[in-house]
Amino acid sequence: MIKYSLSTMALCAAFTSSAADLELLHSFESEVYTEAQPVKSFLDEFNHPLTSGDSAFTYNIFELGVKYKGFSLGAQSRYNYVLEFDPDTALFTYLEKNDLSFEKRNYRYLLKGKQSTTHGVFLAYDIEALGNGITITPKVTYYQSAHFQDAVVDGNVFSDEIKGQLQTEYYFSRDILFKSFTPTERPDGKGYSFDLEVKWQVNDDLKLSIRAKDLINETKYDGVGFVNGFTTEVPFTEQGDSIVTEPSVRFQTSAFGGEIEYSFEHDARYYFDISYRYNDQFSFDVFTRKYNSDTFIQSNVHYHFSDNWSIFSGYETHSKAVELGITNKYFGVSVKTDKLDLDDAYYAKINWYFKFAF
């Protein structure tokens, strides 16, 4: 009887110890940024006064999982969209959409777009390195995907006339450009991504962090639709020896069951963060992130009104956005935008997280 009681106590102690190391994790982050037009106008009429710019993006991620003794495992859903364009392309679109006068010249027309939706599982592990406050966290996500777009349109268009030279490389699960070559069955995509984070707790007050998201990101699709080819102006001589041109169009497409296999990739994003605890009431952050050609730098001020809780505010360059948030060890939420009237905003972000220890 005594032996049984001791065994039961040992099992209970082991379970209690294990449960204490187990955490439920959840996070959600959604951000959108556009140049040349506010977000609403960019997606709709393109009728806001034109500003300079050459990029737009939205990154959205939902995660739910558990963490145990440094291992994190869970489910993930993502929607990413990245667009690069020439400022001349934005001007051409603005003039066309609003029935304004064109100059008699060639307009540079360049669009590079990538879009994907994925659902999968992730695994991460915190590696305590060298006992010097350094933690290295590799993270691998395996996912499936049935929706993506990968497009490049490059060339020039003369004024508002149907003249010019354009090269097109377009791969898709659904044809949103030509609206004629959507595969009868959705493509089947499987892929993976690799993220890496290094944290260094320099001392009790100073912490540094370097992150690379989508350091590797590759998806292989089967049954992909495509449109590849070019338009150009072909000169010929009319009677009287005058030279005129007419447009020529040459495209290869996936029509009539010509779908193919395709490998799709997203570009990496890089982050460098510095956090400093000034005293019991105040701490400061400097966050730097680079997305393709865009670099954002943000500074935050935290006010700690208890041992666990703080409120913070920050300003970010490039997006010119202000962030407000509240956070503690187990919960946090923040919003960030450059305009209170979201109809006029070029940037908007919301994110939250919580951790629940058993």
Regions found by a protein language model. Name each.
Residues 157-228:
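Loop-centered beta-sheet repeat module
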Residues 20-26, 69-75, 132-140, 194, ...:
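Transmembrane beta-strands of outer-membrane beta-barrel proteins
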Residues 14-17:
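N-terminal signal peptide c-region/cleavage motif recognized by signal peptidases
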Residues 91-96, 121, 191-193, 275, ...:
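Surface-exposed extracellular loop regions of Gram-negative outer-membrane beta-barrel proteins
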Residues 223-358:
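Outer membrane beta-barrel transmembrane domains
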Residues 21-184, 228-248, 336, 340-358:
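A subset of solvent-exposed loop/turn segments in beta-rich extracellular surface proteins, enriched
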Residues 57-59, 116-120, 189-193, 267, ...:
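Membrane-spanning beta-strands of outer-membrane beta-barrel proteins
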Residues 2-8:
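Sec-dependent signal peptide recognition
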